[in-house]
Amino acid sequence: MDLKLKDKVELIIAATGDSGTATAKAFANEGCTLAVTSTSQAKLDALIPQLKGAKAVKGYVCDITKEADVEAAVNAVVSDFGRIDVCLTCSGYEGIHQEIIDATYEEFDINFQINFYGCLWVLKHVGRQMKVQNGGTIVVLASNGSYVCCGGIPAYGACKHAVAGLLKSAAKEFMAFGARVNYICPGGLDTKLMRKTVENFLPGKTYEEGCEIFSHAYLDNRLCTVEDVANAMLFLASDVSSHMIGDALCLDGGLAVDRK
């Protein structure tokens, strides 16, 4: 199926993480123009040569916890390419195992700075550009933590629920100028962040042992992959999903089938 993304300008936030890299490669294969961000120039330099199918690629150093960085990156992309047709946000942070009775400001703060405020600043400044250009599409990598919670990581659960509310608000506001907002909610995702999850919940287990244990929570007995995420990003970025607005695309292997 031709997703008609070839001539689109795609901004991929946090493109050098596991999910971001898989997403960037998938959109490069569609022949898109790619603007990719990372907190590290060295990581951008390593990623860009891998995106051979893209029409054009340029990297931008950006820390999404800093609004000024996000604003500068968005302005630079528009200066370089004229517009932003699609914005894909792939950042994420889980943190440490910490129960509510042991909660610290620092742990909640870093979760909200990355997962919530980072998303807010991207929505704010990309949304402004999409209002100017009368349209666009935004897809955010969220989490099944946006609708279910695990004990022991309350900061993560709280901010992911907050992100879902923020995205639903953005979906309502942004359709006034023709921009769609949707988000993806994977369950256990086989990335470097999963190593932190294994450490948090299964101390003493190897990563492989932890993944095997976690996989049994899903009806298909496997974790979500970065390729699953990239394919969902392609779908939501394209007009194939044009009637989806403010929706969560769940990639959770049926984990929460009784709660949806």
Report residues per predicted region.
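Active-site loop-to-helix junction immediately N-terminal to the catalytic Tyr of the SDR YXXXK motif
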Residues: 99, 103, 149-157, 169, ...
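Conserved glycine-rich cofactor-binding loop
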Residues: 16-18
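Substrate-binding pocket helix/loop in short-chain dehydrogenase/reductase
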Residues: 98-100, 104-112, 214
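Short C-terminal tail/terminal secondary-structure segment
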Residues: 97, 234, 245-260
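Active-site helix of classical SDR
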Residues: 123, 159, 167
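Short, small/polar-rich loop/turn modules that mediate ligand/substrate recognition or access, typified
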Residues: 175, 180, 244-246
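Residue(s) in the substrate-gating loop at a strand-loop-helix junction
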Residues: 143
